[in-house]
Amino acid sequence: MTASVSYNRSLSKGRWSFILLWGRNRVLQSGQIANGYLAESTLKFAEHNHVWTRIESADRSSELLLGKQTEPPGFEEQFLARIQAYTAGYDRDFPLIPGLSTALGAQVTFYGKPDILTPIYSQHPVGVILFLRVRPRGNAHSH
């Protein structure tokens, strides 16, 4: 089950968009419910710049503790913890390939997790991405 609300507004030299999303899964065996939430906002400004932020929260089950192992006989999936991710990013459009829209960018994500998940996520989990974005020119999607 999912639900979402989005908003998109043109600006003089850019665009602002926002989405709020919720999703729910139910474990078939136990009927246990797991929820996930996401809020994201992107601002295109000065014609060639994009900045965004995203907040995510997701319920994780005991299956996470198995790693790559298969579920042992009689294993019952149980709620384990809620994990959060906080992301901020930036990219700048520049002409590189004719007919394509290209940008260089970066984003950083910090994670919130309970101590029980430190062996899986580490003490202070952080992710950093540097990227080259390439897409067909004329795409109305602003990020």
Model-derived segments and spans:
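Residues that define the transmembrane beta-barrel architecture of outer-membrane proteins
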Residues: M1, G14, I33-Y37, R82-Y86, ...
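Outer-membrane beta-barrel translocator domains and adjoining extracellular loop/strand segments
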Residues: Q29-G36, E63-T70, D115-Q123
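Outer-membrane beta-barrel "beta-signal"
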Residues: A88, S122-H143
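Extracytoplasmic loops and strand-loop junctions of Gram-negative outer membrane beta-barrel proteins
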Residues: L21-G23, Q69-E76, P114
